[in-house]
A protein has these predicted regions:
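Short beta-strand segments
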Residues: 45-46, 81-84, 120-121, 153-157, ...
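Conserved, well-ordered active-site substructure
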Residues: 58, 432-434, 438-500
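Conserved, well-structured core segments that form the ligand-binding/active-site neighborhood
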Residues: 169-378
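N-terminal short beta-loop-beta anion/metal-coordinating cradle
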Residues: 53-83, 377-383, 387-390, 458-480
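Short acidic, glycine/serine/threonine-rich loops at helix termini
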Residues: 54-57, 129-133, 163-171, 256-261, ...
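N-terminal basic/disordered segments at the start of proteins
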Residues: 9, 13-75, 160
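Cap/lid and interdomain-hinge subdomains that line or gate substrate/regulatory clefts
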Residues: 32-46, 53, 71-72, 78, ...
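C-terminal structural cap/anchor segments
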Residues: 380-440
Length: 512
């Protein structure tokens, strides 16, 4: 373990964090100007919804029809997100989805006469379908648009989440210490496990030797801070034939140097594809790191979503299909993530009190004979609870895995489908004042299948750099009569301090 400073590495106990060069400060305005001059929109294919937690004021799509993408392209923003949710899919389905999204993007951009740059945003702890996704995206760009990718920029840093890269080794911070990502619980993931913390070795591991570590160029902190844009641009420009380039970052200024270099290389005619963590998107789009939303701002967003519905509800309302939704000022918190940090945060919220707690047994949810009854019973309990309190629904904390990664992913999908069924049954009868989803797969499925969100605006975060608040676009919410827009909070499973879920719920309540 090694103690580190966010920007300089000072205070470290030697090793990779000793003697780092001083930060080269880059104003956000410089990157924003370069982005405008480039004339290219940043299109972020997000493999789960947590990638939006570093940005504000940008659209997010959960559907990728040509019309939806055209809507996003017409918004006056430097970037927008398309939630592909591919991290929850097996390899074949993930590839098919990426292919469909890129085809629709190319067609929409052609109609709107827009140029674009594609970002494959993935996990800052290195889980996900790599290199599958960048391969499929590059192939589809070549076939559909004649665009040949030269280099793949690999920059997994998530500064606010404590995921940083120094000397090509990716680290996870916990308090004032850090551990190499290959030694973390995330490296043991049942679906996306790996062993390498050094990014060049990680590329070799995941590509099964297609790119050997010695053949992978790298951008170090020395390059970023001493060489600057000129040196970094030269490294990026050297990539050909979709060669990955791995990149250090310890602070936002490092990422802004990288962004300016990338824009310069693109202006010179090179095509870069990005496989990155959340922080790079903000830097490359030229967006400011905004302060967390204030209680007053959150209250305004909540009030916009609490206008009473004037139309009848059907389907999952559970009655004759003609009853009106009952509005509640209380919120629904859905915790599907089972990683250790989510479990600690859930326990803290339950200790804090003021919530009704309902736990769903995972083994029961996986039993076709028992699951429907368990979900219906839980939905009744949630509806009753929302009349007087915020309600927390969580899955049991034991981790059930299958004999192989595909089977383990199928278990996670089945559990998530049960949570979606529950949310649909609840919101068909009661409209919560807000919904919080904890965990990547949980967040995506609750947003799309549970709440029917197709288009939304990312309004900001509830904590610095983490926990994103979406405001759905009313006329693009599927089944708007049955599911009026409800403020939706995306809370990644693997980020935040122990009391952060408590803080998020308190802010949404409007508590001091």
């Amino acid at each position: 373990m090694a103690a580190i400073d966010d920007r300089t590495g000072h205070g470290a106990s030697g090793g990779a964090f000793a003697g780092l060069p001083p930060v080269r400060e880059v104003p956000v305005a410089d990157v924003a100007s370069a982005v405008r001059s480039s004339g290219r929109r940043l299109v972020v294919l997000d493999d789960d919804p947590t990638g939006t937690q570093t940005v504000a004021g940008v659209p997010v799509l959960t559907d990728w029809s040509v019309e939806d993408i055209r809507w996003a392209l017409r918004q006056d923003t430097p970037a927008f997100y398309i939630l592909t949710n591919t991290r929850s899919l097996d390899a074949r389905a993930a590839g098919e989805r990426d292919r469909d999204v890129v085809r629709a993007l190319v067609d929409a951009a052609r109609i709107e006469h827009q140029r674009f740059v594609v970002v494959s945003r993935s996990d800052s702890t290195l889980r996900g379908h790599f290199p599958l996704e960048t391969d499929v995206i590059a192939d589809t760009l070549a076939l559909r648009a004649g665009i040949e990718v030269d280099g793949i920029v690999v920059a997994p840093a998530y500064i606010e989440g404590g995921r940083v890269t120094v000397d090509s080794v990716h680290w996870l911070r916990a308090g004032d210490t850090a551990v190499p990502v290959g030694e973390s619980e995330f490296a043991k993931d049942a679906t996306f496990g790996f062993v390498s913390s050094e990014l060049r070795a990680y590329v070799e591991e995941k590509t099964f030797g297609r790119w050997r570590a010695a053949e992978v160029p790298r951008v170090t902190l020395e390059d970023l801070r001493t060489g600057g844009v000129d040196e970094v641009a030269a490294i990026l420009a050297s990539a050909r034939g979709r060669r990955p380039v791995v990149c250090d970052a310890l602070c936002d200024d490092d990422l802004r140097v990288l962004a300016l270099a990338a824009i310069r290389v693109e202006h010179a005619g090179r095509v870069l594809l990005y496989r990155v963590g959340p922080s790079f998107v903000r830097a490359r789009a030229g967006l400011e790191a905004r302060a967390s939303l204030t209680p007053a701002e959150v209250a305004a967003i909540r009030s916009a979503g609490q206008q009473p519905s004037a139309r009848p509800l059907g389907g999952d309302a559970g009655g004759d299909g003609a009853s009106l939704a009952e509005a509640s000022s209380h919120g629904l918190v859905v915790v599907g993530s089972h990683v250790a940090q989510s479990t600690r945060q859930l326990a803290a919220l339950l200790r804090h009190g003021g919530v009704e707690a309902i736990e769903l047994d995972v083994a029961t949810l996986l039993d076709p004979g028992q699951s429907p009854v368990a979900i219906a019973s839980a939905a009744d309990a949630v509806v009753a609870g929302l009349r007087s309190a915020d309600v927390v629904v969580s899955t049991s904390r034991e981790v059930l895995t299958g004999p192989d990664p595909t089977a383990s992913l199928a278990i996670a999908r089945a559990v998530s489908a049960s949570l979606v069924d529950l949310v649909r049954k609840v919101t068909g009868r009661v409209r919560p004042g807000f919904v919080v989803a904890k965990g990547g797969i949980t967040s995506s499925d609750v947003a799309t299948a549970g709440l029917g969100i197709r288009r939304a605006w990312v309004r900001g975060t509830l904590l610095p750099g983490i926990v994103s608040l979406w405001e759905p676009v009313a006329d693009a919410t599927a089944g708007a009569a049955a599911h009026p827009p409800i403020p939706f909070v995306v809370f990644a499973g693997n980020v935040g301090d122990e009391d952060d879920l408590v803080s998020v719920v308190a802010t949404l309540r409007g508590a001091p």
